[in-house]
Amino acid sequence: MEDNNKTQAYDSSSIKILEGLEAVRKRPGMYIGSTGEEGLHHMIWEIIDNSIDEAMGGFASTVKLTLKDNFVTIVEDDGRGIPVDIHPKTNRSTVETVFTVLHAGGKFDNDSYKVSGGLHGVGASVVNALSSSFKVWVAREHQQYFLAFHNGGEVIGDLVNEGKCDKEHGTKVEFVPDFTVMEKSDYKQTVIASRLQQLAFLNKGIQIDFVDERRQNPQSFSWKYDGGLVQYIHHLNNEKEPLFEDIIFGEKTDTVKSVSRDESYTIKVEVAFQYNKTYNQSIFSFCNNINTTEGGTHVEGFRNALVKIINRFAVENKFLKETDEKITRDDICEGLTAIISIKHPNPQYEGQTKKKLGNTEVRPLVNSIVSEIFERFMLENPQEANAIIRKTLLAQEARRRSQEARELTRRKSPFDSGSLPGKLADCTTRDPSISELYIVEGDSAGGTAKTGRDRYFQAILPLRGKILNVEKSHFEQIFNNVEISALVMAVGCGIKPDFELEKLRYNKIIIMTDADVDGAHIRTLLLTFFFRFMYPLVEQGNIYIAQPPLYKVSYSNKDLYMQTDVQLEEWKQQHPNLKYNLQRYKGLGEMDAIQLWETTMDPKVRTLLKVTVEDASIADKAFSLLMGDEVPPRREFIEQNARNVKNIDI
């Protein structure tokens, strides 16, 4: 950020206190989202965000995360260092205040930070409250200070000056989550690395280091992107064939007046985008490094600018007449990869989760900046401008044909309970909150599943063969595909751009395929379809993967089912002298209806894997790589991950 962010002295008076910390351990989910895996990672993000805030303010250049055995988590930066003097309100050291009082932090004082990105603004004190051990070292003017806490924020002694140190300034935090409050689950290296890399892209010039010492051979990662969003777009489009090589980029910092308040804000806008030859849109937006997955006013301003400029150039260059139907926002987004990142001192979000930006003053600002850079690009690059217009016109024509096909289908069979696909064996209940749809590979297994199910709440939809690979297909092909049409009709929500979540007919949509390569391919094809065309179902956790057994072990008139080779080997080691018969299931069709119910469909005993997406941009890149046209990066990915192919996270 600019030098004018380096404002007044950073001392105890900069730390503003809003409320106490008592409720955190009683209701941790209110503060970090959950006590499970997501909440565990959220604790890391809260401490990382404090360091990134320092960097965004221009006070730090390096942030480092280290993971050690036994969940020891260390975050350090070379920022100013937390003030060490006595806080005027608490009469305790400011370091102790920051880590024991909820909402105490420099981010609430506009003179200390111009922008801030803490996920819920609750700060490091919540992490302290949820930690069994919490230590902090502060360097100020080559003096090192130390303070320790335990048992969820109980301070151990006073802040201690440990004397001179090599480091001029900075902060180091070490914590261990308290598993009497948090659920014990591993940190995911892939999730952490992806988020840290994303932060490096969004904050150009900042170095972020990650050291994972939990294994016998420690792994180290380091990211620094002087190109910022331009390098981010290149990274996202690496598996896609670009329409042209140029990445369009612009940035601007401007002071604008708030529409709803009598005050002005200095807002920084960065935008980068590039068209590719796919049919999917990949628009990712951020405010203060927070991924606004539902968009908001910054995305609206971006899209409005593109629509305006493309339509004007289309008319001026005789692609369209003034009286022709104009190119729409859906048309201009086909094959577009874009990043919109803003830094705002007072962001307003719709809802508590910060998924949609609501500041109305942002829309015209982004519109103005994007219009300026995009118009200049179109004027200076007529060949690329024509390629963009032709692509959007092809998208417009495909949209028209798709609309005609949809209308024809609706006239033939308006979607109601009487027009469900013929192969669907629906459930009896009409209560979506308890009903389940099993998508089953093949008519044979579908027949077994129909017999074995609980027909009151379980519906079965058999699919014949592999569905269309939507990553390589145009919307019109997708809509006319028989298997996909049956799936869309059964689910009931439609597909984008006409997706309506409130029409969902089943709370759980369960993919049940064979445990072989073909089954895995069908699962991937279905997941690609859900991600690209029914993303809200993935986002809110409606998609599941069934886990049918791989083995049946029979001994002493007992049958035992196992889902993995690991389970089988562990059982063998525990029963070395037991005589048994072993059956390996090659497919669902080898089980009878009772076995399928008892192992895979009975809610009391079955195992379901919920499909979740930690970060849409990471998943977008994974699907493009695995299901797109580019062979070399897919081969490289498979070679690198061949040994872990059963555990690929997207």
Swiss-Prot record:
It comes from the Bacteria. Transmembrane segments: none annotated. One of its GO terms (molecular function) is DNA binding. Mg(2+) 1 binds at E441, D514. Residues 435-549 form the Toprim domain. One of its GO terms (cellular component) is cytoplasm. The keyword Nucleotide-binding applies. Its cofactor is Mg(2+); Mn(2+); Ca(2+). Binds two Mg(2+) per subunit. The magnesium ions form salt bridges with both the protein and the DNA. Can also accept other divalent metal cations, such as Mn(2+) or Ca(2+). Heterotetramer, composed of two GyrA and two GyrB chains. In the heterotetramer, GyrA contains the active site tyrosine that forms a transient covalent intermediate with DNA, while GyrB binds cofactors and catalyzes ATP hydrolysis. HAMAP family: GyrB (MF_01898). Belongs to the type II topoisomerase GyrB family. This is DNA gyrase subunit B. The lineage of its organism: Bacteria, Bacillati, Mycoplasmatota, Mycoplasmoidales, Mycoplasmoidaceae.
